[in-house]
């Protein structure tokens, strides 16, 4: 199975200030990318192939609980039909990242808006 991790424009804009604040974040995100390639459905399921991942920010020194949250949307495509039908190509879209100390939880409305925004811009 081929897994691609894709950064959305929204994720990129939310990431910018965090990169300035936390010098370890690039390395932490590389670890996350590796983990997502191994397990695209990493984190807590929020329904409809959307997941919330607790990300440790090493330079914060607070572990996963005080780190960042990453919202992902997983898309799978079947390439070719064989006897065993399974997704052959998976894309993990990084929709949002936020510092847990700045934002407690993402609301259902914010989540729906994120997905709607992604679906509008990805077509």
Report each predicted region and the residues it spans.
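A generic structural signal for short beta-strands and their flanking turns/coil linkers
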Residues: 32, 49-51, 68
């Amino acid at each position: 199975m081929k897994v691609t991790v894709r950064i959305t424009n929204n994720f990129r804009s939310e990431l910018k200030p965090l990169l300035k604040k936390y010098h370890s974040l690039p390395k932490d995100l590389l670890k996350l990318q590796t983990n997502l390639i191994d397990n695209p459905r990493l984190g807590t399921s929020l329904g409809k192939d959307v997941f919330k991942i607790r990300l440790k920010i090493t330079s914060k020194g607070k572990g996963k609980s005080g780190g960042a949250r990453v919202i992902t949307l997983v898309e799978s495509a079947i390439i070719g039909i064989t006897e065993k039908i399974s997704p052959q190509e998976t894309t993990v879209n990084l929709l949002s990242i936020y510092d847990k100390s700045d934002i407690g939880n993402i609301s259902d409305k914010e989540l729906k808006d994120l997905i709607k925004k992604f679906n509008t811009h990805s077509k």
